[in-house]
Amino acid sequence: MEKSYVKFETPEDVSQKALDLVESSYRTGKVKKGTNEVIKSIERGESKLVVIAEDVNPPEVVYYLPSLCEDKKVPYVYVKKKADLGSKVGIASAASVSIVDYGKNEELYKSIVSALEQIKK
């Protein structure tokens, strides 16, 4: 069943790159996990990339994140499972994660943003 908050299909390779970026950014301590922290980072202009799980239940938990990201011009990407996203930030599951600082991974970040621009055209 397709979730109403999923606005586009993210190719598997882009999702995997996003998970890799989340994991490496987590090691530097520059990620926010959990919807409330993610919202704060977006509203404060700190977020560089938001990663949202597609299997969040109830969907209302993350329903407004894509619209908020678009309003604040923050790129966002989807991954299939919240368990996969959570494992990259040291918890069982995460509905959403905000990358505040991608550290030395600028090339990976740019490749994700570039791919997202192509998908949304």
Curated annotation (Swiss-Prot):
SUPFAM superfamilies: L30e-like. Keywords: Cytoplasm, Ribonucleoprotein, Ribosomal protein, RNA-binding, rRNA-binding, tRNA processing. It is found in: Cytoplasm. The keyword rRNA-binding applies. GO terms for molecular function: ribonuclease P activity; rRNA binding; structural constituent of ribosome. Its main location: cytoplasm. GO terms for biological process: ribosome biogenesis; translation; tRNA 5'-leader removal. InterPro entries: eL8/uL1-like, Ribosomal_eL30-like_sf, Ribosomal_eL8-like_CS, Ribosomal_eL8/eL30/eS12/Gad45, Ribosomal_eL8/Nhp2, Ribosomal_eL8_arc. It comes from the Archaea. One of its GO terms (cellular component) is cytoplasm. Part of the 50S ribosomal subunit. Probably part of the RNase P complex. Multifunctional RNA-binding protein that recognizes the K-turn motif in ribosomal RNA, the RNA component of RNase P, box H/ACA, box C/D and box C'/D' sRNAs. This is Large ribosomal subunit protein eL8. The lineage of its organism: Archaea, Methanobacteriati, Thermoplasmatota, Thermoplasmata, Thermoplasmatales. The gene is rpl7ae.
